[in-house]
Amino acid sequence: MFPKTIVRNTLLSNAEQYSISYEVRSVYNTVWRIDINDSITIPYRIGEKGIYPDYSNFDIDDKLAYLCYLTRNQSGFVRYNAIDELLTLVHKQIWVYPYILKLCDEYVIRILDRIYDSLPQIINEQFVDVICLNMNNIKKGYARMISYWNVYYRKDIPNIENYVGYKIYKLLIDASQTVHKS
């Protein structure tokens, strides 16, 4: 399924530098590249509990950063609500893409369904650049997705090609291969 990794040697046209920081606590955190010289570290999970602030009045960058942060919450409900809103704003900043890609290896099928339904609208040249720059993370996510399917969904969905997680990774890989052919 995975092609040889060939990273496009172009800078992403609209990439802006942002400093997003939080305390790193896990060896499971992943580093995602957003262009040739820039990367972000995404925590595996955050354990924040309690009341979340009303972010409706945040400016767009603060709102995006907060929603990205919530996609790492230990609660699947919080992650789903964050990705649901994030997917409507995704075109605002390139650094949002890795957070979406990280959620593609989830076991919560509602999250996967929501991402899959949105992918045709959000796959663009910048999104594909981020996929290509992070093919090792994509491969790890694919393996993780297979593992979750095997444990949680194989009985109900015996053909992995019918599993939404597989469909997501197929779209991602196909998109990355299309770029290299053009």
Outline where the language-model segments fall.
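Long, helix-rich interaction regions
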Residues: I123-S182
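Amphipathic alpha-helical scaffolding segments comprising HEAT/armadillo-like alpha-solenoid repeats
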Residues: F2, I60-C68, Q93-K102, V128-C132
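Conserved hydrophobic register position within alpha-solenoid helical repeats
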Residues: A82-E85, I111-L119
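Short coil turns that connect the paired helices of HEAT/ARM alpha-solenoid repeats
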Residues: T71-Q74, C104-R110
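Alpha-solenoid HEAT/ARM repeat scaffold
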Residues: A65, Y80-N81, P98, D113
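Residue-level signature of the C-terminal ends
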Residues: T88-L89, S118, I122-Q126
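Amphipathic alpha-helical repeat scaffolds
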Residues: L67-R72, I83-L87, L101-K102
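Long, acidic/serine-threonine-rich intrinsically disordered regions with weak helical/coil propensity
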Residues: M1-Y52, T178-S182
